[in-house]
Amino acid sequence: MAKKKKDTKHTRLCEATGAWATKVLEDFRASGNDSYVFEQQLTNSERGIIHQMCRTMGLRSKSNGSGEERRLSLFKGDGISKSDKRRMYEARNQKEKEGDGISKSYSKHRYETRFQKAGGIRKTRISPKKLKCVSFPPEAKAVLHDLFTRYPPCDGDTTGTSLGIYTTGNVNSNWKDDFFKKPHMTKHDIENNVVSLSSRLKKERHFREIFEARSKLPIASFRDAIISAVESNQVVLIAGETGCGKTTQVPQYLLDHMWHSKKEACKIICTQPRRISAISVSDRISWERGETIGRTVGYKVRLQSEGGRESSVVFCTNGILLRVLIGKGVNSSVPDITHIIVDEIHERDSYSDFMLMILRDLLPSNPHLRLILMSATLDAERFSEYFGGCPVVRVPGFTYPVRTFFLDDALSVLNSDKNSHLLSAVKRDFKDEDKVSLDEAIDLAWTNDEFDCLVDLVSSEGSHEAYNYQNSTTGLTPLMVFAGKGRVSDVCKLLSVGADCTLKSKEGITALELAEKENQFETAQIIREHAGNIQSNSQQAQDLLDKYMATIKPEEVDVGLIVKLMKKICSDSKDGAILVFLPGWEEISKTKEKLLDDRFFAHSAKFIILCLHSRVPAEEQKKVFNRPPRGCRKIVLATNIAESAVTIDDVVYVIDSGRMKEKSYDPYNDVSTLQSSWVSKANAKQRAGRAGRCQAGICYHLYSKLRAASLPEYRVPEVMRMPVDELCLQVKMLDPNCNVNDFLQKLMDPPVAQSIENALIILKDIGALTPEEELTELGQKFGQLPVHPRISKMIYFAILVNCLDPALILACAADEKDPFTMPLSPGDRKKAAAAKHELASLYGDHSDHLATVAAFQCWKNAKASGQAKEFCSKYFISQVVMKRLDDLCRKLQGELNRHGVIPSSSSNCSLNAHDPGILRAVIAVGLYPMLGRMCPLSKNRTRSVIETIAGAKVRVPSLSNNVDMSSTKFDEALIVFDEITRGDWGVVIRSCTVLPTIPVLLFSREIAVSTTESYDAVKSDDEEDHKVGNVGDAMDIDKEVGRPGEKIMLGPENSVKVVVDRWLPFKVTAFEIAQMYILRERLMASILFKVKHPKENLPPHLGASMYAIASVLSYDSLAQSSVQTVAVQPITSVVDATSPRDDIPSTNPNELREHDPNTTPMGSKLELANKLGLGNMEESLPSNFADGNEQPDPNTSPVEDVSAATKQKKMQSESKRCKSLNNVDLGNIEENFGNMEENPPSDLAIGNEQTLPKLASNLDMGNMEENTPSDLANGNEKTEPNSANSMDLGNMEENTPSDLANGNKKKEPKSVSKLDLGSEKVSIPSNLVNGNEQHDLNIAPGEDASAAKQPEKKRSRSKKRKSGNNLDLGKMEKSKPSDLANENEQTEPKSANNLDLGNMKENTPSDLANENEQTELRLPNNSDYGNMEESLPLNLANGDEQPDPTTAPMEAAKQPKKKRSRSKKCKSVNNLDLGNMEENKPSDLANGNEQKDPESVNRLDPGKEKESIPSNLVSGNEQPDSNTAPAKKPKKKKRKLANNFDSVNNMEEKMPSTNVLSQGNKSGLIEEKPSIPSDQ
């Protein structure tokens, strides 16, 4: 322990080594070298320092050798060159192809796969434990079954979707934006403007004062020189010190010159690196010209602008101008621009550097264009050389002298009672005339012994410049003169105020040597003693510094030292504002808190403490420019934003922490870094210059002189320390045929090759570039939108699944600060975490992104009720960020509309905005490939840890909702996150969201398939898998004889191993992975279609596929939530912030059910969400409210148990309204059947209307007076749906909707003779149970259908209706309700004679568990339907509404026996009069119910067909033979709980959240082999 303490002390003392090592490491990281070896012999302690620094900076370090030969080596990433990685990859690929049994990749294209960034080729090692099984939920299987029956896989699925055959779009398409066009101004208009300006100058006193102040700026005397240089040269560089006035005056000089001298209109574009600068400067210039913003001067920043074409001067950010140059095309954007001013080029942001490269290439072909570069640092020569030696106009700054102290001096100041360090801050400037006077006084004193003048000057100046001034001719100083002349008192005085006794004259002698030469022994002795004291003091200062450095960490800001220094300044001086430079918001908050806790600064009348940060509202930021009242000192705590972007003119004292938060990118490890780093010398100079605005100032640099000497000259250019994926895309848009790497080498400082390679991989992953690096139409569209390319893809996907609003929120939030604030006290932190969890729980919890979406929705609702401030306070949310997000979302939506991506009315674009499954999928698209999986828990770990694709282990941030996912059910859960950040606290991920597996399979880059151990007879489940690190690049199935993968896909139920992105293994059935592949292809095809044709409908097969994808995502989320739902304790006091009522339900599932028994459990939860502030559910929920009827949300999963008492209350529950696949709004089932709406589908792009295909030709519904529901409870009447003629059914099975579980049987009905349909299968519509009503499918528009309100009716009049080809279906006399409970009988209909229906299979419900049987039904002959693609069993005609067929059978409540009702007369197919069908009863029995077989009938008279079975029987209902008298009632069987029901929730069957119109078959598995193209 003692040794460790000694080493630590030594490490802290050796600051010189730390400063030197920091410089070496930073230079190495900025270089293009892959390795570096220290040639110096380092001690163990020094090597320890460097090893620790390397870990922080993401570098690898290793020591080799022994003794004097021991050397320390540094490496970037894994130390393996890219060429070696490529050879390793090819060798591994060849090995895999030759004999490891891996089938080739399911991807048809060659992807350039991202390799492990910190370990070369990833050696995927599958855990010996069983693979995680992945399967579609039963409801999703039914949807997929319907999809692939109607639109089976074919070659057209991949046509146009392969990245290799994308067509390059017109990258120079016209973008109609006249903001950068030259104003329409005649010479007369220009003269009027000049006269108006002159008139105001004469008449308005305020305007004259402004003009006079402008004329006193340092740059005013250089006006003519600047104008002349601009007229004579195409490029001019103005190097002006901060405060000279270049930013505000140069644009006005150019404007006035064009108007006054040339009488010409002009368009002057001025770029700024920051939004705040562009807006504030344009506002300042407008004020100086006596105008309002938006007239002569305007601005345009991202999603915000003032002014337009008539603005002659436009301020914008660098990114805006860059987008204009690229987006509009170089041939159409430049001619209207006369001048481009690029300000603050020394900041070297990536957009600025890239734009300068483009402009340099444009200048030769645009001789009219003038480019003015402006910089505030000494790096002007380099920029001049970059533009071929352009002229430089140097403008001095208008600042007073500033004295600088370093940490060594500051510590001495704090230990001293004197205030001599403040003397220079109260004296006037040392000017040229003072220098002339001193020259004369020194000459007179030395030659004529006239000392009075020199003594007076030195005393009056009182500055170090005067004390140490050297004569311009002789080099003598006042101290030398007084020492050589023996003036002891003057020598003592000069030495006491800091005169330097080490200076030498031009003859090379010091004051001491001159005194000895002149035999002035007394003064010589005084100087000799003083020099000894200085050395002693210097040693004391060094000792003091060493002791201080031993107690702190140099990389951390010492807030306590800053407070002590401010107290010292305020005690020794009376006025002058103090500006403190700090790295970030955390340090600002800590400093402010410490100041307020100190009694010295607690008096608000004496001190005003202000913060200058991007998180601070604009109104608060403006206060820093106001001068405080007399007797009050202003203290400003700021980041580097105060270096050059803003100027505070009353600052006298500057405290520089020497640190700055800088975001950078490590391309070798593919990790972003946000660390506090040391400033550059240029930054330090800028900060010191802030102190000399109004008088002489002082700057305290809180780092040593040794550290100051080791600082880099300038900051590393942003293009070298940030990802360049956006720049690479812009390069391809500018020149589609160029090589990106070669193009970027033209930059002043090009990025490293590894960074460019990483960017190209991302662009290929999202489809913006082909594998050959060609620009795709998808990439062209991504580049036009004002968001990151990944965000662009997320927006397009969100539009396709009707989930736009959350996507806009997430897109805008990606570039903003976290809306959730971080309280300082532990108690408040716990409350903030609970509040965030409560918001996220509205969408299933375990997501930081969904918490942001919920917070924004709740805030908008609270804002509408005037409670936004209270809501933000109680939920620890930044109202500033919320307002900002609201503004950005509105503007981004306008931009999308302007680009034609969405229609002007986008109210229907967010019908699925509250579906958790679809929301998580949208997040996955926007964040991919930032994917990881949760590591299993360990005893010593308290925080969640994520494993990335590179094999790195990163932590979840402390404020994340997923920080403490301690349950083992989250082991290996998949996580998507914003980015990996290496900070001072370690390597963490940013905001993250837990994902189900199916979205990952859908959106991943590639999926590879191999056999599982269970398929191999040699291996067991417990054996380790073979390596899957590198698989083939084609998605073809290996069919060579003898190969292990020969029969992978031949059996649909065979289990296969699927490896996602070459590192995530899962176990899936061969049939389901085949379906997944087709869905992937159709998803990409849908996005491409939407990009090319944003205002057109998707083709039918793509529309149906997007609907199916949305349904799968929704059902999968419901299945996941039923397993992983975690109760969140509500914050009662917080809830009141948005809803002061007392009836707000808790988030506890049981309480939700008790709150409203008539809603689905998730419906109650969404009701809670609505009351908490989720806005108008009628506008956003996928299921709509029709005619004022309330309706529970069908898009959510039941998550609570439904008690028997609750079920009894639901005798007649509200039916659900659902959108069908083909955009038909089925309306409310119980009421209001008159007006049927056609709404945009939840799966198709907004604005596309698509109606249901007609299933019957010339359907005539006849005059139907009463159409009661198809499934009636409590004795309600019911009619039979129409059949359709000439329908191509394809290979359709008859799928009943209910699920038979726990040993339920369904016996085979007897077949009818001579029945042959050609393997045709029929799908029976699903029904509503538990007293839910279902209206007739063919009900006429406007007809009242209130059968549910007539439980006492026994009989109703028969109705005559027509079916396909005007066929009379005869009379149906008796129609029993479809859902009969408690041993009600029901018979089957007789089949008609001579109908050739072929082999038609009747499939039992979707999930047949425990030996459920599946039977075959033969239907009458001579009615050949052919292959029908449209398999929807429910028809809509003449505006008839259709009940929701996706409603699953629920547990029936106890109901009284129902009497028989008269059935209706209906027509069948092919002109056959089916006669009187007496009894129509349900077709399916659930929970142990038996169904008897119908007797076979030969050549039955179609005139009297009896009993057509609509749907279901539940809860012990029997079904007798359809062709005999009702059978004897069997004993009532005890109902069993279905296996597939959630054991915790014990609820109704889950409903889809995408308005799913699914078939009754829930299995989703086609019994035949999957129809997959041979090339798949």
From Swiss-Prot:
Gene Ontology CC:
nucleus
> Which reaction does this enzyme catalyse, per its entry?
ATP + H2O = ADP + phosphate + H(+)
Q: What is its main location?
A: nucleus
| Keywords of the record | ATP-binding, DNA-binding, Helicase, Hydrolase, Nucleotide-binding, Nucleus, Repeat, RNA-binding
E.C. numbers: 3.6.4.13, 3.6.4.12
Boundaries of every R3H domain copy: 15-78
- Where does motif PH2 map? 1454-1465
Q: What class of enzyme is it?
A: hydrolase
- Per UniProt, the ranges with Polar residues bias are 1281-1301, 1381-1412, 1509-1524, 1540-1562
Query: Which GO molecular function terms does the record list?
Result: ATP binding; ATP hydrolysis activity; DNA binding; DNA helicase activity; RNA binding; RNA helicase activity
Query: A biological process (GO) annotation for this entry?
Result: DNA metabolic process
Q: Does the keyword Repeat apply?
A: yes
InterPro entries xrefs: Ankyrin_rpt-contain_sf, DEAD-box_helicase_OB_fold, DEAD/DEAH_box_helicase_dom, HA2_WH, Helicase-assoc_dom, Helicase_ATP-bd, Helicase_C-like, P-loop_NTPase
Domain (Helicase C-terminal) spans: 561-735
- What does this protein's UniProt record list under function? May function as an ATP-dependent RNA/DNA helicase. Binds DNA in vitro in a non-specific manner.
Family that this chain belongs to: Belongs to the DExH box helicase family.
Domain remarks in the entry? PH (probe helix) motif serves as a DNA recognition helix.
For this entry, the protein name equals: DExH-box ATP-dependent RNA helicase DExH2
Query: Which organism is the protein's source?
Result: Arabidopsis thaliana
